[in-house]
Amino acid sequence: MRKFPFVLCVIFLILGLLACGAQPAGPDMTTKEETAMLKAGYARVNITPDYGVPMSGYGNDAVRISSGLKSFLFATCVAFSDGEDTVLVIQTDLSQADINVVNEVRGWVKSKHNIPMENVMIAGTHSHSAPTVSGANASMEYRADLIGWLEEAAGEALADLKPVTGIYYGNQNCPNLNFVRHYTTEAGIIKGDGLNALVESPYTGHTHAADDLLQIARVDRQGGGSIVMANWQSHPHRSTSESDKELSSDIVGVMTQYVEQEMKDVLFIYFTGASGNINPHSRIEAENITKDYKEQGNALGKHAVSILRGEMSRVEGTNVQVCTSAYVAQINHEDDHRVEDAKKVVEFWQACYDTDQTRRVAYTYNMQSIYHAQRIIERSYMGVTQQIELSAFSVGDFGFAVAPYEMFDTQGVTIREESPFQATFVISCCNNAYGYIPSMEGFENDTYEAYSCRFKPGTGEALADEFMSMLGQLHTTK
């Protein structure tokens, strides 16, 4: 009888200890990074029209209707998902992205796959031998077809999501494959390719050396089918003359074919970098340059394969993050007198356009002056400011800055070199089409990209700073 209370005490003690063990152990401090299972998906869809369409170029008044085919055009999509957040980037063999097309596709992805609209990004390779999708000349039939094809690419990439076993990064300088298209002359004048190509004195050099760094990322996946991403800065090679009416994926298509044939089990996607002032050819180094888009694409492909077969650095991390910013930029308005002068120039040119006087007008004003006058008038009808949607995302320790405009190479270098991430791609011509936004050097050199820009000088540098802030924000929370 005397032992019973002791036995009860022991039992109650054991039950108490068990009860304590069953209590919550405090908050779960496991991070998203530690639990994420990164997956990547890929898809490629043919977006070549089988009918004649207006083609993109330099905004020429003459409309080129396609009548032939050099190579097929594609939309290529890569998707990344960590189980919580998903991002899709669709690269198209088109000049640029049209915001209305982008929003249609974003809306479809959101409704079908519950992915936020800002997590869907659509870019152009900036091909000048592709259908135009913006403005009055665009084919509405092609736009409708394109939207369906882009939705198809997004859906297929999401269906293709497979576990990532590793991401690897490498780069290589590619001399004589791109050039800054602004030149100094013996007369101390800055000239450029395009509308101000007439020169009063011989060229003496480039305003600065081009950013010739080719970046490559390889995303290995469970079961094979590695995704290879390339980031290179250059305008296309193909002509935009009135006689050139053949559709072409240009340098990108040739580079894609070369890499996939050489490396076999890889899936290639190309992103256009900061190339607003970069061409694939030079007026003063003709003996060193590639002669056409096929030679250019194969040369870049060889560099890419060299990187892939060499030693690449493993990129750590598995989480996916997206950041957006609505930057308010100032419109570069001219005074009333400049606007009136511009109207007189355009009126005179239009009166002589397509007549025997066209050549005389070109010599009177030169095409650069006419182009400049047109832009001055356009800006006079704009408001004081315009909002520019910037995007950035990260996959582990890999950052991506997504620009809806043609960025100059110096801004791209700044973002890449000052980014807190192990590696950073700059993707231009993505999500919208704000045209050129030059560096301060571009404005000071008085080139046609500066004439074309609707925003005030200094906007390019301010946007680069904004991208750095966005990448910093992503890096601190990765």
Question: Model-predicted segments: where are they?
Answer:
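Conserved beta-alpha junction segments in alpha/beta enzyme cores
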Residues: 29-123, 131-267, 271-284, 288-298, ...
